Regions:
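Short alpha-helical catalytic segment bearing the HExxH-like zincin motif
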Residues: 87-92
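Short active-site segment of divalent metal-dependent hydrolases/proteases
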Residues: 93, 97-98
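Histidine-centered, transition-metal-coordinating active-site segments
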Residues: 1-86, 100-106, 110-411
Length: 411
């Protein structure tokens, strides 16, 4: 009988999963839930190909981790089999705490608890079921293990999470800028004093990686239409929650119903087992099914927003470098309340103003160390000939104004 399972992945080809702990994790219901959650949430409103799931991403990141362990070992870095298995388990589980449309859900229904916190709660829960087999994986995930480079491979500037999602998201969206040479970067990785370093001949690959990441952020992750659909979903769920807490009857799956009809804060999420229990029952289907049914609800705010989500009648977006004036805000709200025959308070659900800040490289977070033949190291910001690092470290702030289109405004 074979000692491994082989999965064919469109991005990396054949991925080998050894039987035992790692295969048990892949088959676990908590990881299988990620097959029902899209990696890029609402980005398919812009890039119709972006239908891939968080499960596919977890497998891809696992594959890259396996390759990295092989390369680091071949360079004479001693990694115990137990450490290799633990770091592979940690990367398989790194996204287990994502809900459907993750950031939307965190901010509207999950009481502001981040997916990283939920991932850890779920790992600890799985660890109990698996009789402590994930102890080392959790230590690495929490950065409590002496070999720091293992944590850096799970969560750092050059982690396997990023190396996979840039390649994968580029592949499925068709945005070629993200198509980084992950294999080349992995070959350049090494370890010095228990920290991850990159061989000096890999500088150009790293510069390319940082630039690709920046381009993918503005073209995919922060694309104005994706931002608009996200804001629209936030407002739809916020309205649904407001109606639910007023006692209005709404269609919802049992898990979604739990979050709509109970006001939940961070403290309760941590202390009530019901929160986690219901959270792991949620996936994209709960949200889409609710939106379909809410499209015909008697509440004009909820039904208009839900229909907009279902039929891709999304908010109009303006991206500016300065904030909106009070007068402009009032003008938009007046038009919307006339258009839908609703009051100003209700009209606010059809306007969203936010700013987004993004810089690709923060030295203080996790610098990328370049190692030279003589053993000395320098940060990429100093080692790079290109001036792009100073550009990448600069904060870029954009203001997004999203609002309901007027009736005579096309797409």
């Amino acid at each position: 009988m074979s000692d491994r399972k082989i999965i064919n992945d469109p991005v990396f080809g054949f991925i080998n999963i050894p039987k035992g702990l790692l295969y048990d994790i892949v088959c676990h219901p908590l990881l299988q839930r990620l097959t029902r959650i899209k990696q890029l949430g609402l980005s398919s409103a812009v890039y119709p190909g972006a239908q891939h799931t968080r499960f596919q991403h977890s497998l891809g990141a696992f594959h890259l981790m396996s390759e990295t362990i092989k390369h680091l070992t071949a360079k004479g870095n001693f990694i115990f089999d137990s450490e290799a298995e633990a770091v592979q388990a940690a990367i398989l589980l790194h996204d287990i705490g994502h809900g459907p449309f993750s950031h939307v859900l965190e901010n509207t229904l999950a009481g502001g608890v981040s997916h990283e916190e939920i991932s850890l709660m779920l790992m600890e829960r799985m660890n109990k079921d698996m009789k402590g087999q994930l102890n080392l994986a959790i230590q690495i995930f929490k950065d409590e293990y002496p070999k720091k480079f293992l944590h850096q491979l799970v969560s750092g500037q050059l982690d396997m999470d990023r190396l996979d999602y840039l390649r994968r998201d580029s592949f499925y969206t068709g945005v070629s800028e993200g198509n980084i040479g992950s294999a080349g970067i992995i070959k350049m990785l090494d370890v010095k004093d228990d920290h991850l370093v990159v061989e000096s001949k890999g500088i150009y690959s790293i510069e390319n990686f940082l630039m690709s990441r920046r381009l993918m952020y503005w073209q995919v992750y922060l694309h104005k239409t994706s931002v608009a659909s996200e804001k629209m979903l936030v407002n739809t769920l916020t309205r649904a929650k407001e109606l639910a807490l007023r006692g209005v009857e709404l269609f919802a799956s049992p898990a979604l119903r739990f979050f709509l009809y109970h006001p939940i804060d961070k403290k309760e999420f941590y202390n009530s087992p019901d929160c986690l229990e219901n959270f792991i029952q949620l996936d994209d289907n709960d949200i889409w099914t609710a939106l379909k049914v809410w499209s015909n609800h008697s509440d004009v705010v909820l039904s208009t927003l839900s229909r907009g989500m279902i039929n891709r009648k999304l908010f109009k977006v303006e991206v500016t470098s300065s904030s909106i004036t009070k007068a402009r805000k009032e003008e938009i709200l007046s038009r919307i309340s006339k258009q839908l025959n609703i009051n100003k308070k209700e009209a606010k659900y059809f306007l969203s103003i936010s700013s987004i800040e993004n810089n690709m490289y923060k030295k203080e977070d996790d610098s990328i160390e370049i190692i030279y033949k003589d053993g000395s190291t320098r940060d990429i910001a100093k080692a790079s000939d290109m001036l792009n690092i100073s550009l990448l470290s600069r904060k870029v702030k954009k203001y997004y104004i999203c609002y309901l289109r007027s009736e005579n405004d096309g797409h």
